[in-house]
Amino acid sequence: MIGRLRGIIIEKQPPLVLIEVGGVGYEVHMPMTCFYELPEAGQEAIVFTHFVVREDAQLLYGFNNKQERTLFKELIKTNGVGPKLALAILSGMSAQQFVNAVEREEVGPLVKLPGIGKKTAERLIVEMKDRFKGLHGDLFTPAADLVLTSPASPATDDAEQEAVAALVALGYKPQEASRMVSKIARPDTSSETLIREALRAAL
């Protein structure tokens, strides 16, 4: 099992990042909240990973720390929640925001995420709240809820298209993704910034 990668970022195509380790390129799926904190292409990154094997694919999911990975693992144990939906959840809100929503039993923020209806949100709250009790110590620190301020990639002509594609990959319908991006689009804005602001506005 691959649990950690340390290598050079070759390409960033949200929500995917290509990391080269020892001459091998690993394609890693990352929640956007983690993706924002990655360094630029050409720089070294350390990513904690979870390896998922399916009949038709072998996928790596990456996170900036072990706590985020732990939350992802707990999420995919929930009935009806697979890796794709877990990725969408942790892209739409930070890990700390999700923990807070569960502990406060707030259904509202969860049902705004793609693929989550009221029943799924209620089930998440019940199951995850029980799991949090079984974890030793605090799963996350208050610092995990800080606004991410890492520098964004330079804007490109197709930044809006990249942002829409990333939102679709996270589970939003194409028309909905286009509408979300068009609402907050501004000249000279990077795709990462567009994605972050679109997800924030959706909540």
From Swiss-Prot:
One of its GO terms (cellular component) is Holliday junction resolvase complex. Keywords: Cytoplasm, DNA damage, DNA recombination, DNA repair, DNA-binding. GO terms for molecular function: ATP binding; four-way junction DNA binding; four-way junction helicase activity. It comes from the Bacteria. Belongs to the RuvA family. Residues 1-64 are annotated as: Domain I. SUPFAM superfamilies: DNA helicase RuvA subunit, C-terminal domain, Nucleic acid-binding proteins, RuvA domain 2-like. HAMAP family: DNA_HJ_migration_RuvA (MF_00031). Residues 143-154 are annotated as: Flexible linker. Residues 155-203 are annotated as: Domain III. InterPro entries: DNA_helicase_Holl-junc_RuvA_I, Hlx-hairpin-Hlx_DNA-bd_motif, NA-bd_OB-fold, RuvA, RuvA_2-like, RuvA_C, RuvA_C_sf. One of its GO terms (biological process) is DNA recombination. The RuvA-RuvB-RuvC complex processes Holliday junction (HJ) DNA during genetic recombination and DNA repair, while the RuvA-RuvB complex plays an important role in the rescue of blocked DNA replication forks via replication fork reversal (RFR). RuvA specifically binds to HJ cruciform DNA, conferring on it an open structure. The RuvB hexamer acts as an ATP-dependent pump, pulling dsDNA into and through the RuvAB complex. HJ branch migration allows RuvC to scan DNA until it finds its consensus sequence, where it cleaves and resolves the cruciform DNA. Homotetramer. Forms an RuvA(8)-RuvB(12)-Holliday junction (HJ) complex. HJ DNA is sandwiched between 2 RuvA tetramers; dsDNA enters through RuvA and exits via RuvB. An RuvB hexamer assembles on each DNA strand where it exits the tetramer. Each RuvB hexamer is contacted by two RuvA subunits (via domain III) on 2 adjacent RuvB subunits; this complex drives branch migration. In the full resolvosome a probable DNA-RuvA(4)-RuvB(12)-RuvC(2) complex forms which resolves the HJ. SMART domains: HhH1 (SM00278). Has three domains with a flexible linker between the domains II and III and assumes an 'L' shape. Domain III is highly mobile and contacts RuvB. Coiled coil: none annotated. Residues 65-142 are annotated as: Domain II. This is Holliday junction branch migration complex subunit RuvA. It is found in: Cytoplasm.
